[in-house]
Amino acid sequence: MKKTTKMLGLLMAVLMMGALLTGCGSSKKANAYVVLEEDLGAEQYGIGFRKGDVALGLEVQKQLDAMIQDGKAAEISQKWFGEDIMLKDVDYLKESSAPANDDSLKKIKDKGTFILGLDDSFPPMGFRDENDTVVGFDIDLATEVCKRMGVELVVQPIDWDSKELELETGRIDCIWNGLSITDERLAAMYFAKPYIANKQIIIVPEGSEIKTVADLKGKKVGLQKGSSALDALNANPVSKELGELVELQDNVTVYSELKAGRIDAFVVDEVVGRYLISKDAK
């Protein structure tokens, strides 16, 4: 009788432990994050060059156009997005021919390197992998462009808030990292053609009371400092009614703040935001 009682006690203990472990596991389930149906406006990505470097910008565009025609750009897009998202048959935004005295392409050919400036925390366009190597969609595009141009790609991480200064002082040859084309940037840089469509989205925790842009009133909203997300938000009347605006160095950090519950909403490029959410879901 004692032996039977002891066995029953052990069985009950095992069952209780299993229930406890199951409960602990479910309590650690990660929160889900959703994108609001209403966005803060559509835009396009482009490659930014110094205003006078038209010849260089046109050569890079020539190689990109060739990659679109021969399918290489679609192959790279499929790798990162699972579909071809490259814009096709788009017009030049500025000059489609360079002045005779423009030696910007010759300088790149002579030195043999093409320095790409980027925010290295901007997945999937350009970011560091588990080996601390900068990878991404834009990096793959630029690598192929440089291969066709016969020069070496040099990836140079920069402070995104000072990107225009980095370009103007010659520390980098272009800004190629999910760079949204805005009127202000068009006035300060040379862009050939846009290559990807984008929009500014709002990410919130699933079940949040924030359902529309207007619901941001009184809320704590985070975004990347110096980004087009800030421009898009400032262009909306709700920007004057926020509880607090939090500007941080990069989007990965802003997303971490959202997951930690320290901000209520995250304004970000759709390409980046959906990638971050999809990585969390895996």
Language model segments and positions:
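Acidic, polar ligand-binding/catalytic clefts
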Residues: 30-39, 143, 147, 152-215
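Extracytoplasmic small-molecule ligand-binding "clamshell" domains
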Residues: 56-59, 63, 67-75, 79-83, ...
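A ligand-binding cleft/hinge motif common to bilobed small-molecule-binding domains
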Residues: 25-41, 162, 179-187, 234-236, ...
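Bacterial N-terminal signal peptides that target proteins for export
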Residues: 1-11
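C-terminal motif of bacterial Sec signal peptides marking the signal peptidase cleavage site
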Residues: 19-23
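A bilobed periplasmic-binding-protein/Venus flytrap-type ligand-binding module shared by bacterial periplasmic
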Residues: 43-62, 200-210
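Ligand-binding clefts/hinges and TM-proximal coupling segments of bilobed small-molecule sensing domains
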Residues: 32, 39-41, 62-104, 110, ...
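Short loop->beta-strand "edge-of-pocket" segments that line small-molecule binding or catalytic clefts
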Residues: 112-118, 213-230, 241
